[in-house]
Amino acid sequence: MVIEKRESFIEVVINSLLNDNPAQAKFDKYSILVSLGFSSLLSVILLCIFTLLRTKFNTYDRCIPPMKKSLWGWIEPLWSIKVEDCLYNMGADAVISLLFSRFCRDVFLILAAICCTILIPINIVATNKTLANSDSQNAYAKLSIQNVTGNWTWAHVVICYVFNVLVLFLLARYYQIVMRIRQRYYRSPTYQQSMSSRSLLIMDIPTTMRSNNGLSILASRLKSSEAPMHVHICHAIKNLPKILKKHDNAVRSLEAVLAKFFKNPKKLPDDRPVRRVKQGLLTSEKVDAIDYYSAKIENYGLRVDAARESLYENEFEHYGFITYKSSYIAHDTARHNSRVAGASVSMAPEPSDFLWDNLSLAWSTRLFNRMIGNILFIILIIAWIIETALVAIFISNLYHLGSVWPWLQQQLTSRSGFWSIVQGILSPAVAGFTFMILEIIMRRISYWQGSFTKSSRERGVLNKLHIIFTLDNFIIYTLMAVFWRLGVIIAYKTKEEGNFAEGMSAFATFDTVGLSVSSFVQFSTFWIMFIAHSTCSFFVEIAQPITLTIRLIKTKFFSPTPRDLLEWTAPTKYVYSQVLNKLIYFFTIAICYACINPLVLLFASVLFCVNYLTQKYILMYVSNSSTESGGGYWRPVVNRILLGLELANIILFLCLWVQGGRVRAYCIIPNFSFAIAFKIWCMFALDPKSHYMIEDPYMKVVEPLENEISESEMCFGHPSTYAPLLVPMVRSDARALLPLFYSGRTETHNKFDFATDSDDASEKHLRGEEEPLENVDFVDIDNVDTAKEVHDQQQVQQLKKNLSRSYTRSRGVSLRARLNEEELPLTESITQDSQISIPETLESQSTEITPINVSEHYDKYYHIF
């Protein structure tokens, strides 16, 4: 019997790392093919599902622009309509987001054509001449710069200059387009008619000036061509938003109880619905659920009314608003005044864009939260390296996991086909799932740091996501295999020498830079799989299989409330930080591999083409902007594009340095100055014309007359001070049975025969002689589209009533002659939208309402996809 010494764990790992493994190269090849095949098949299936369901459920008469009823009728508007012409339909943020997607598409279509036709043949020829046994090499390695040395790399230097000039040239052209679009947005009727376009937000007002008279004195110190028309400093609202939220939760709870009880009005349950209420620490009793929630609704409603009536008895906040006659005067004043008397000055955002809780925070609190938030972000970056290491080392390359798991190593050898499928699907899926978690964490940190507006919070999320994606999920993710190899070698050396100090000596002889560059080049196969899977994800967004499945299950097996049904018909909210971060992430990956592995460019060009078409359809027919910042995302996006360009230059410089071409590496250095010079040019030539409205004698700015500005239009403050209270929604076929079970007040008129209140009714509301508001809103669940339209009209009418009441009017100081009471129009808009405007509160308290121009965008309410 012969006894053989068994290799130790460290020796097995060392052999697997240091020795070339032809099986692994074949395994990686099949993994890429499986990944591409799976992504292509799933994309085709999702596209077919979307095409079939769209023709069945779409409401064509309300689509703007209209679509044909054919299977592929949805593609024609995407080709025929220019993005620039959709400004008034989609908004500036949506247009600029699509322009950035189109910019990426143009860049990578041109780069893919250049690099694939020039660099790939050069790489193949150079690899065959460099390596005698090139036939045994990985086919993907032949397409890259991995084995290219000598004068062959001059082609990569030339291409580096080409893509730097190309990116900056196209970026300059798109920058000018964005500048013109933002100026068109500033001059649009929708923006001009909004109160916020003519107002300044004054933050951190000194204690001695926290009054309307003090704010008037502060306004007189501003460098402005004209005096302001109106100033208003806000009052503290204390616990009013919490009471309003409890009221809305009680309404939704009552709706859930009634929806379950009246699920089948022809066959009601024998017993009334009940719920358990705590009576003590350990005891509870059953009470009638309908009566319980009805009492809570009435109680919270009275508390909300009392809090609103006593609002102006509260102390003043440290922020206020100054309103001018025209938007140009407000922009010009904001341009020349950043601070005055210790207070900060900026353009007032839209009412729906405010984060009112953060607006009330003191300067010291915001500073402390910002500091703690940055510390937490740094800790998260470091902690996320562990997750990145596990995924990068073991999931993206199962042979690394097999080196420490003998059973898996045996399986990889015997069943390589099956495990290549697992690696091709699992690794990009796990990476995508971890990226989703990051976005949620970043948004919470940005909110806690004290962002004033939702758009600034989203820009903060974009900045943080870009840092952690580029650092952790791209650079460290790609180089983690090198760190793994270095750690194993140090452990092996320590065991062999019996001394950790001797083990660390291996670090001195370890070719860190060379192996890092080699790992970066070899990791291109993973990024090809990841880009292919991400392309498939865009078809998931447009087909919405998960959302439709969840809603189908809820509809068939549960009891959704009428409000749920109405909310499902509302357009979804488009999250720009998430979408733009993904595009920047893909741009950074693809541009870094432009000269290293041109095959990545081919897949990136397909990804951006698919993204442009799908996102254009979504923004035209499916989603709305949650808030409108007027294109404020463009400058952060450009900064990150320039950073990605510089990172690509650094990586190519290191590759050429490792390949022995020191002179060729030095030739890359001038490229670093191009992006810096471009940024300086943008700061002085383009940014001032983009951030503020500029005076143009050929474009007339709509300036409202003094007698066209009503007092109700001067309404600033937290939306909870004027938002209509929610009323319970019940299905219309339960109208006759409802009085038997519900003791609250109801209206007997048909909601589908909705009519606006007359002038006499409005006067009654002003005098306080209003009729009791209805406590129940009946909804025909068999005709949700019509019910949605009627309910929206009712909410708008109720909002106008609230704005006409005395406690919601601005009690600021008017710096012009007051109008007579008979001349005060009571139904002016207070938000950005013309004709029908709904503040952010309706969005937050009744999510089926969206702040859009209903006459132009109502098709989105009815469009299922």
Curated annotation (Swiss-Prot):
Residue numbers on the Extracellular membrane side? 1-31, 128-151, 396-420, 492-511, 604-640, 687-865
PANTHER family the record matches: DOMAIN PROTEIN, PUTATIVE (AFU_ORTHOLOGUE AFUA_3G11660)-RELATED, PROBABLE MEMBRANE PROTEIN DUF221-RELATED
In the record, the note on similarity to other proteins reads: Belongs to the CSC1 (TC 1.A.17) family.
Coiled-coil stretches noted in the UniProt entry, renumbered to this chain: none
Known glycosylation sites: 128, 147, 151, 624, 802, 853
InterPro entries for the chain: Csc1-like (IPR045122), CSC1/OSCA1-like_7TM (IPR003864), CSC1/OSCA1-like_cyt (IPR027815), Csc1/OSCA1-like_N (IPR032880)
Task: Give the record's membrane topology.
Answer: Multi-pass membrane protein
Cytoplasmic-side positions: 53-106, 173-374, 442-470, 533-582, 662-665
Where do the TM regions start and end? 32-52, 107-127, 152-172, 375-395, 421-441, 471-491, 512-532, 583-603, 641-661, 666-686
Keywords from the UniProt entry: Calcium, Cell membrane, Glycoprotein, Ion channel, Ion transport, Membrane, Transmembrane, Transmembrane helix, Transport
The free-text function statement in the UniProt record for this protein reads: Acts as an osmosensitive calcium-permeable cation channel.
Where is the signal peptide, in residue numbers?
A: none
| GO MF, one example | calcium ion transmembrane transporter activity
Q: What's in the GO CC field?
A: cell division site; cell tip; plasma membrane
One GO term of the biological process aspect: calcium ion transmembrane transport
Q: Which cysteines does the record link by disulfide bonds?
A: none
Localization annotation? Cell membrane
Instruction: List the protein's name.
Output: Uncharacterized protein C354.08c
